[in-house]
Design a protein with these regions (language model features):
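Short amphipathic alpha-helical segments and their helix-coil junctions
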Residues: 14-30, 65-69, 87-101
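Amphipathic alpha-helical repeat scaffolds
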Residues: 7-11, 117-118
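Generic helix N-cap/helix-start motif at coil->alpha-helix transitions
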Residues: 1-5
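N-terminal interaction modules that seed assembly of large macromolecular complexes
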Residues: 12, 16-55
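Amphipathic protein-protein interaction modules
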Residues: 69-121
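Glycine-rich, aromatic-bearing surface loops/beta-hairpins
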Residues: 118-148
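Alpha-helical rod/repeat scaffolding segments in eukaryotic adaptors/tethers
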Residues: 21-33, 54, 58, 99-106, ...
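Helix-rich alpha-solenoid scaffolding regions
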Residues: 52-66
Length: 148
């Protein structure tokens, strides 16, 4: 279910199809927020590693955010730069301090993570499914290793 919902959300974002995007991200937001964040974060991290094998500079992170916001604004004017920053930062392992409230909802994550994924896929001329499959495999392996 998560795989299909995320694939639909990313495909709608790539196509700039507002109606399909809203439907897909509403479905994605109805799923377990921790799992959605884990999977989409793993996809984002892999994409960033592939597209920037020597690491990301601050300017490159800013370029991703600006490019993503600029492209999405035309068909999704609700795009929130703060949510993009938090999604991208989370994928890179940068999280708000635990004493600070997280200023985004699970719906914000469900909407903004696919926007960033779609932007990176388009920029790198990549397909979503291989990244999703690899992320799901890594997560399943990590969970299996955590079992007693």
């Amino acid at each position: 279910m998560l795989a299909d919902c995320s694939a639909s959300a990313v495909a709608a974002a790539v196509a700039a199809n507002r109606e399909e995007f809203l439907l897909a991200t509403d479905r994605l937001a109805s799923l377990d927020a921790e799992q959605v964040g884990l999977v989409l974060g793993a996809v984002l991290r892999s994409l960033l590693e592939d597209l920037h094998p020597d690491g990301l500079t601050g300017d490159e992170v800013q370029d991703v955010i600006v490019r993503c916001r600029t492209q999405a604004t035309g068909w999704f004017p609700e795009v929130d730069v703060n949510a993009l920053v938090l999604v991208l930062g989370g994928a890179l392992g940068v999280h708000p301090h635990e004493d600070e409230p997280v200023p985004v909802t699970s719906l914000d994550v469900a909407r903004h993570a696919p926007l960033v994924v779609a932007d990176l896929l388009t920029a790198g001329d990549r397909s979503y499914r291989p990244y999703l499959d690899a992320a799901l495999t890594r997560i399943a392996e990590a969970e299996a290793n955590d079992l007693p």
